Amino acid sequence: DRIIIGGDGSMQILKKLAKEGDMKIVAIPKTIDNDVGATESSIGFHTAVDVATQALDNLQSTAASHRRSMILEVMGRDAGHIALNAGIAGGADIILIPEIKYSIEGIITKLNSMKKHDIQHSLIIVAEAVKKENGNTVLHKYMDGEKRLGGIGDYIAHELMKKTDVECRVTSLGHVQRGAPPTASDRILASAFGVYAVDLIDKKKFDRMVAWKDRKVIDVPIDEGIRTYKNVERKDSLVETALSLDIYLGDKT
């Protein structure tokens, strides 16, 4: 009997290995992207949001003192949950996520509107999966030759400085988001998931994934956890919250 821990990609691989090895498994969702659709929350997400929020807090003072636009690039392979949540919590003026189309002109319009109110600095948070305005994916080539998501913050900065007199600085958090001490809520969630997973094994209920829904732990078929993907939806209450706070979130909101 095995407990497997990971995101949708890890679960797909481990489920296949378990089938080939004739192992009985129970899965626990752990991904900072929070994109496993069958659960409202995954282990690691709240910690990543907390790290990104602290980064925005730290960038606020230097942005104000030097009258700059500080751009923070955060993880989010396909979904913008980290950027959206941290952006609201950390007081970002602009939040860019892959689910909502943006334009450089839209960003400039927002910055100009702020200047009219004598606000000469700004905080921009962008998920790594956000594409260029022309729809091309931004990839960073590493020393091992692999190309991975990364660099959209630099692209946004370049475009803004090319078209305006705004001075930009870019910070990419990278794996700092994955290595921070877990928040209390993540520790509690992990404990609840672990206890429930062991109980499933005890009851010989296999090929199940534990999930968090309506403030309690439930279990669903592993295939459901793998198959369903959770993006930020336009009707998401946090999208409405961001818009009500006058945060720029794209041109079609």
Q: Which residues does each PLM region occupy?
A:
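C-terminal non-catalytic interaction/assembly regions of soluble proteins
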Residues: R148-T253
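Conserved beta-strand scaffold positions in the cores of enzyme catalytic domains, especially
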Residues: I25-A27, I71, I95, C168-V170, ...
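Short, ordered loop/turn segments at secondary-structure junctions
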Residues: G7-S10, I28-N34, G76, E99-Y102, ...
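Accessory alpha-helical/coil subdomains and C-terminal extensions
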Residues: I4-G6, K16, G21, F45-V166
